[in-house]
Amino acid sequence: MIDLIKYPVINFKSYRALVLNNQYMFNVDLRLTKPQIKKLIEQYFEVNVISVNTHRPPRKKRLYIQTSPGYKKRYKRVIITLQKDQEIPYIKSLMASNLAAAMQRVQNAQTSPNSNEA
């Protein structure tokens, strides 16, 4: 059952949606419908889902190798809105730690002197 939820989307846009609107983003199997996704999230994470929005991002080409040309697998992206007083603690802490690491990398890149300039 959990195989249908592939992984949470962790980037700046999803973190902003989490903080401002209490929305979580997941990539899920293409075959799932909105009612199935809602039931799956409510059962697995024990939260109350207010709304489910879905979309299918465009396919991306694979690195061209003559023996295996084609596209990457398709997936469905889901935006789940929870009630204001509820959260998924594991995903929230995962996003916060990744955001902190990314901000640290940006600060290090800005403060380190550029070795190419001489």
Curated annotation (Swiss-Prot):
The keyword Chloroplast applies. GO terms for cellular component: chloroplast; ribonucleoprotein complex; ribosome. Pfam families: Ribosomal_L23. GO terms for molecular function: rRNA binding; structural constituent of ribosome. GO terms for biological process: translation. Its main location: plastid. Keywords: Chloroplast, Plastid, Ribonucleoprotein, Ribosomal protein, RNA-binding, rRNA-binding. It is found in: Plastid, Chloroplast. Part of the 50S ribosomal subunit. Binds to 23S rRNA. Belongs to the universal ribosomal protein uL23 family. This is Large ribosomal subunit protein uL23c. It comes from Stigeoclonium helveticum. The lineage of its organism: Eukaryota, Viridiplantae, Chlorophyta, core chlorophytes, Chlorophyceae.
